[in-house]
């Protein structure tokens, strides 16, 4: 807080020494107070007026705005004289202000200012009528009264009388025009800092930590301009689309006297809005999104904006981006950038922001880069101090722990958990698929490594994210959705405990498909929830937020995708944040936490981060923690982070993938335990404290040379430096698990040699010139491949072939010796073996080509393995008998195929779809059968998943028509779309008539899920009632004497 106060005080004190500072110490709330009017009169003596005069002035401003809007289309380049004069005056004050801050600005101002003929540095100060020599002679003669002429003195007095007083207003309490409640102490200081920037003609960056009220401070500044400077607008506030609603609410809540419009909508709506709302000019502030600015830039260029505010300013850090280029074309008197994340990019991106704020000062990127020497800036303390001095006048950043003492604390606990049995199987399968990458020390493809990382992270989250992993069809939502994921097991226990405590929970994940799984889980457990991701429409987004934040809301969980839900959303009614998975960039996770840990939060916030132990996740979190720690050290010192240190190197990714691989291979059993959630949390809290302590020590030792620590922390593990091992080619060999599979080694060896699957870089070994061409899908007898392999080895022996060493395989020397040993000991085929070989060559499916085989596989996928008749129709030129014979051999010997895992996955996916279609048809039949007139009587139990777009009448029509036409019919949704368009009841329903076939398919899938859930509940009730009746039925005893 002391640094914050000092920074603001230094900025204000750097104003002109002759400036008048009006301190407003106490105000009574109300629409207009005498103190306010008095302060305004003292501040702007030349323009002060009575209340009637102020209204007249405001009317004039509005008429000027209207006139500007009307004239602008004729000549966009035409500059208003008043605006031009203001810009010129601001430039002079800006240069003077910056030079008072530090002489370093002379380096930037001099070259840029000299180019402008109107530069204050090029202006002559005074007009001496007497030459220097003459004046000096008069002084030496004792004549002081004639050294300045009467004309000179008159001109100086007239010039001084024409100057307006440079007044800087400084608030001590919350301004009276702020109606939503008093500003906090640090927010008042932030407002004073913004005012001082405006008065000195300087633009700036407000970089307070998220949740400290940057929005409120910005709105208060615009209110100051209206109430104290008679500048109601026009102002533009440029924000992300997701925060439009929030900005409009904040304007209405805090400074309702500002007339605010929201520019958003489709093409027709925008055209009407421009005509009816924007061009008349009856507004002060225009709030719009980045997308709208890009689409309607010609409209926005017609205005001379008094203040241009950009929220999430990192969007313009690339000066060549479309948005950055467009906003630079707008005419604006002042500019303000808002960002909640620290400046963590390279020097050139910082220059892009400074160039946007002060293009007349920072006009050369090359000059800026050379002055701060990108390579040496982070290591040279003098350059660091120089950069800090340049940033200081423009940048204000405070963090919660320093300024917001009343905000409850935030505590993060990392919960380490194990893999389930299914997760271990899938994790092993992913690693085995790319085992050559794990054990390679040569060149690696970065995209391949990124893909492996992504697949491993999916496995850590939930194995059902992979197609074919979930048991079914039919698919059910019950205990297996929890027990097959280690994270879900812990989450299930944790949520039950939080529900008992009365907490409300935010769950963040990067994967929207995982949110689908969580939705099913919440419906199964009966938890009421809201959901928000990148596909959520703007209206539904706002409705969900309002429903969750409503007083006495019954919503227990709000699930969000990390990227979509990380910005501009206030969910302070929740007090628990669960990070289901972690982002590469720790700032994104911090943004997610700040949805709950922000002003307005009344409870301590607990953050639970789920981490799968001994997997790639452990390394990802460790790297993110190191990066965050280093960022905080550097930013607090006013430095910038070298962007190169943030890039994920290939070696780094490989170490992450390798981490824990041996542990996973060691067993196939589940690592999940029956510990209660209290024990799990205590262990996680202990490990979190240990990691924080370790990082704290690391930070202290890396203040001067932190780049080295990044490498050490990633490459040092369990006391060993893996960089040295890698240089020596001694990286530990990861032993894959022994596969329990019936293997025919002769077949495998033959096709590995023939297809060259695992050795792409080594030239093919020689083969006999007249060897037959056989394929694995032709299913020749295994004995044939033994004879062919023997023939090849003897041929290589006769020509003296020496096996080369392949550096890309494990233990190349050992593999080379074993292969050469086979060749050296080879024997020729005997006459009996040659005759046997010729006989075996006739026993395979020699008339089946690769095309026939592919058709057979696709037909199995389409119809299922048992529908031989339909499969035979798909394989051209083959009779049903031939296909049946081939199918029998295929399913008996399919493990001999090289790509059997891929083939089986393809067929099983198709069969799963077939079973799914059957189960859906049964569900629809059961639902429709319960009604005599389903088109009029059918009801759907929505629960919490109704949505706001489709009505119940529309949903009823979709389901009944889908059942009537046949769910599994080809192009059924396109036909359904035509039925909707022709239905008389929808002739005026524009919404449903404008939906596409794909949208109807998505809606029907949602409705089918609801129907299946309803059917399951009905079946369970019927079973329970049947069981109940059976227990109540009395036993009747018959007697022989009755």
Curated annotation (Swiss-Prot):
Which species is the source of this protein?
Homo sapiens (Human)
Task: Give the EC class as a word.
Answer: hydrolase
Q: Which GO terms describe its cellular component?
A: ATPase complex; CERF complex; chromatin; intracellular membrane-bounded organelle; nucleoplasm; nucleus; NURF complex
Domain SANT intervals: 843-895, 946-1010
Question: What one GO molecular function would you report for this record?
Answer: ATP binding
**UniProt biased composition (Low complexity):** 36-50
**UniProt-listed CDD domains:** DEXHc_SMARCA1, SANT, SF2_C_SNF
State the similarity comment: Belongs to the SNF2/RAD54 helicase family. ISWI subfamily.
The covalent link annotated as Glycyl lysine isopeptide (Lys-Gly) (interchain with G-Cter in SUMO2) occurs at 650, 716, 738
Could you say which residues bind ATP here?
208-215
Q: What is this protein called?
A: SWI/SNF-related matrix-associated actin-dependent regulator of chromatin subfamily A member 1
Organism taxonomic ancestry: Eukaryota, Metazoa, Chordata, Craniata, Vertebrata
Q: Cite the PROSITE patterns for this sequence.
A: HELICASE_ATP_BIND_1, HELICASE_CTER, SANT
Q: What is the effect of changing residue 966 to V?
A: Found in a patient with Rett syndrome-like phenotype; uncertain significance
User: Where in this protein does the record put region Disordered?
Assistant: 25-82, 819-849
Biased composition of type Basic and acidic residues is found at 51-60, 73-82, 828-837
């Amino acid at each position: 807080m002391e640094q914050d106060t000092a920074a603001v005080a230094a900025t204000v004190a750097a104003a002109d020494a002759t400036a008048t500072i009006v301190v407003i110490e106490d105000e009574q709330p109300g629409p207009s107070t005498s103190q306010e009017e008095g302060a305004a009169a003292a501040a702007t003596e030349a323009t002060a007026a009575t209340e009637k005069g102020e209204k007249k002035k405001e009317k004039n401003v509005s008429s000027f705005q209207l006139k500007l809007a009307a004239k602008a289309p004729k000549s966009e380049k035409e500059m208003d004289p008043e605006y031009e004069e203001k810009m010129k005056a601001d430039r002079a004050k800006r240069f003077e202000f910056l030079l008072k801050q530090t002489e370093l600005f002379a380096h930037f101002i001099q070259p840029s200012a000299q180019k402008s003929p109107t530069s204050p540095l090029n202006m002559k100060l005074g007009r001496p009528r007497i030459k220097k020599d003459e004046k000096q002679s008069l002084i030496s003669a004792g004549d002081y009264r004639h050294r300045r002429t009467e004309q000179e003195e008159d001109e100086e007095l007239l010039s001084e009388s024409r100057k307006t007083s440079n007044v800087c207003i400084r608030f001590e309490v919350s301004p009276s025009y702020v109606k939503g409640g008093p500003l906090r102490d640090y927010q008042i200081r932030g407002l004073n800092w913004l005012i001082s920037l405006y008065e000195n003609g300087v633009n700036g960056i407000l970089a307070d930590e998220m949740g400290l009220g940057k929005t409120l401070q910005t709105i208060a500044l615009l209110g100051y301009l209206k109430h104290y400077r008679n500048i109601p607008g026009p102002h533009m506030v440029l924000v992300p689309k997701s925060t439009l609603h929030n900005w409009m609410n904040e304007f209405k809540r805090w400074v309702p006297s500002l007339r605010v419009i929201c520019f958003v909508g489709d093409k027709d709506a925008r055209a009407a809005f421009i005509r009816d709302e924007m061009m008349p000019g009856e507004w002060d502030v225009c709030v719009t999104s980045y997308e709208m600015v890009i689409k309607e830039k010609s409209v926005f260029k017609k205005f001379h904006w008094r203040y241009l505010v950009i929220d999430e300013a990192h969007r313009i850090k690339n000066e060549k981006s479309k948005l950055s280029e467009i906003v630079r074309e707008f005419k604006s008197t002042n500019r303000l950038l808002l960002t909640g994340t620290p400046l963590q990019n390279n020097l050139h991106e910082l220059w892009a922001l400074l160039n946007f704020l002060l293009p007349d000062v920072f006009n050369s990127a090359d000059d800026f880069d050379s002055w701060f020497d990108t390579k040496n800036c982070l290591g040279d303390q003098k350059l660091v101090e120089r950069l800090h001095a340049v940033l200081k006048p423009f940048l204000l950043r405070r963090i919660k722990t320093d300024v917001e003492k009343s905000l409850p604390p935030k505590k993060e606990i990392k919960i380490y958990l194990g893999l389930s049995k299914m997760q271990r199987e899938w994790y092993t399968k992913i690693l085995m698929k790319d085992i050559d990458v794990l054990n390679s020390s040569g060149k690696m493809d970065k995209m391949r490594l990124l893909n492996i990382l992504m697949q491993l992270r999916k496995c850590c989250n939930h194995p059902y994210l992979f197609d074919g992993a979930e048991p079914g069809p039919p698919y059910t939502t019950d205990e297996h959705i929890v027990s097959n994921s280690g994270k879900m097991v812990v989450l299930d226990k944790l949520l039950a405990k939080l529900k008992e405590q009365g907490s409300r929970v935010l769950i963040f994940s990067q994967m929207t498909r995982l949110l689908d799984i969580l939705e099913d889980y919440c419906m199964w457990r009966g938890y009421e929830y809201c959901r928000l991701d990148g596909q959520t429409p703007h209206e539904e987004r706002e409705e969900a937020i309002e429903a969750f934040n409503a007083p006495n809301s019954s919503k227990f969980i709000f699930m969000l995708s990390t990227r979509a839900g990380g910005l501009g959303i206030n969910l302070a009614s929740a007090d628990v944040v669960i990070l289901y998975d972690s982002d590469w960039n720790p700032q994104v996770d911090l943004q997610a936490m700040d949805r709950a840990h922000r002003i307005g939060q009344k409870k301590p916030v607990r953050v639970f981060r789920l981490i799968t132990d001994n997997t790639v996740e452990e390394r990802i979190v460790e790297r993110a923690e190191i990066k965050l720690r280093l960022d905080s050290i550097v930013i607090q010192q006013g430095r910038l982070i070298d962007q190169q240190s943030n890039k994920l190197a290939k070696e780094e990714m490989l170490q992450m993938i390798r981490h824990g691989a041996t542990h996973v291979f060691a067993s196939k059993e589940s690592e999940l335990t029956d510990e209660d959630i209290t024990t799990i949390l205590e262990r996680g809290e202990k490990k979190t404290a240990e990691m924080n302590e370790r990082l704290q020590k690391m930070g202290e030792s890396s203040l001067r040379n932190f780049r080295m620590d990044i490498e050490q922390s990633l490459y040092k593990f369990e006391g060993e430096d893996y960089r040295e091992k890698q240089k020596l080619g001694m990286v530990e060999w990861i032993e894959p698990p022994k596969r329990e599979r019936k293997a025919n080694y002769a077949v495998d060896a033959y096709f590995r040699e023939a297809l060259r699957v695992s050795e792409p870089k080594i030239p093919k070994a020689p083969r006999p010139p007249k060897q037959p061409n056989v394929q694995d899908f032709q299913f020749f007898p295994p004995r044939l491949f033994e004879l062919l392999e023997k023939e090849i080895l003897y041929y290589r022996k006769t020509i003296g072939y020496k096996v080369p060493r392949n550096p890309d395989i494990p233990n190349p020397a050992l593999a080379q010796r074993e292969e050469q040993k086979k060749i050296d000991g080879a024997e020729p085929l005997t006459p009996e073996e040659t005759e046997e070989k010729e006989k075996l060559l006739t026993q395979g499916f020699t008339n089946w080509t690769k095309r026939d085989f592919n058709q057979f596989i696709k037909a199995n996928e389409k119809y299922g393995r048992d529908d031989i008749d339909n499969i035979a129709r798909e394989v051209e030129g083959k009779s049903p008998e031939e296909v049946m014979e081939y199918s029998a051999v295929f399913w008996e010997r399919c493990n001999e195929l090289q790509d059997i895992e891929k083939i089986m996955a393809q067929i099983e996916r198709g069969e799963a779809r077939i079973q799914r279609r059957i189960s859906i048809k049964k569900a629809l039949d059961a639902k429709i059968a319960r009604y005599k007139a389903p088109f009029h009587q059918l009801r759907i139990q929505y629960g919490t998943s109704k949505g706001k777009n489709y009505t119940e009448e529309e949903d009823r029509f979709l389901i009944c028509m889908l059942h009537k036409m046949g769910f599994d019919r080809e192009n059924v949704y396109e036909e359904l779309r035509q039925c909707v368009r022709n239905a008389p009841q929808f002739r005026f329903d524009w919404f449903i008539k404008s939906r596409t076939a794909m949208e109807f398919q998505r809606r029907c899938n949602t409705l089918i899920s609801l129907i299946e859930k309803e059917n399951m509940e009905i079946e369970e009730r019927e079973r329970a009632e049947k069981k109940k009746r059976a227990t109540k039925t009395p036993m009747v005893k018959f007697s022989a004497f009755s």
